[in-house]
Amino acid sequence: MFLCLLCLFVAGFSPQEQGYRVVKSYPHDRDAFTQGFEFRDGFLYEGTGLVGRSSLRKVNLDTGQVVQRFDVPQPFFGEGITVLNQRIFQLTWQSQTGFIYDKSSFRLMGSFNYSGEGWGMTNDGKQIYMSDGTSQLRVWDPATLKEIRRITVKDGVREVTALNELEFVRGEILANVWQTDRITRISPADGKVLGWIDLSRILSKAERPGPDAVLNGIAYDAASDRLLVTGKLWPKIFEIQLLPKK
């Protein structure tokens, strides 16, 4: 009996929340309904959503200035993006259509299709990871955009659903969870939740324009080891440093 109870306890164990500190803040476009967020070669690449307002942007982090932009045509609702091999991939929400752009010119190179909804994207340099609002992450071959496998994300025995914007950071996948201000740290090998980061206090309610203005945007500057976070319609981007677990 003791061993059975011990097994249940271990199986249901929830990883500890990890603390953070704000290093610096940067300006962010208050009209950007952020759905995709990556940092490459000194610039932010941001995908925004809403029909008629969806876009792909190249942004100067320090000034917040949009230096390059492609407006996604209606009726598409832009979602997550990822930058790989001089190309930018962008999902759409319910149209089952994604777009491929040339990284330098933002020229639309082509499109691709997938089943279900498109939410978030990231890559590890070799494979693309995609979220669809469930507890599963799809792993794609970037050359063919065909699915290789799926990963079910679990915190103990509980599946973590509504996985949204993604970022590959130091060998882990960091994921926003829709309608929360929490980030979950995920093992890409087996989907195990390695920890949580609660950012509910990083931006006051007074600075948020409404209930849809939730945390959604994680970007990692690998060259400088900087972790950046923002949210939909947020006025700021925050550089944060994760604190060692106690």
Segments the model singles out, each with a brief description of its role:
Residues 219-246:
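Blade-level signature of beta-propeller repeat domains, shared across WD40, Kelch, NHL, RCC1
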Residues 158-192:
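Loop/turn-rich, solvent-exposed surfaces of beta-rich toroidal or solenoidal domains
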Residues 30-41, 74-84, 114-127, 131, ...:
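Beta-rich, blade/repeat-based domains predominating
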Residues 98-156:
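Hydrophobic, well-structured mid-protein blocks that either form specific transmembrane helices
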Residues 14-31, 61-67, 71, 200:
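A short helix->beta-strand "capping" segment at the edge of beta-propeller domains
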Residues 63-100, 106-118:
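Blade-loop segments of beta-propeller domains
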Residues 45-50, 88-95, 130-134, 175-179, ...:
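Conserved beta-strand positions in repeat-built beta-propeller and related beta-rich domains
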Residues 59-64, 102-106, 142-145, 187-191, ...:
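Short loop/turn segments that connect beta-strands within beta-propeller blades
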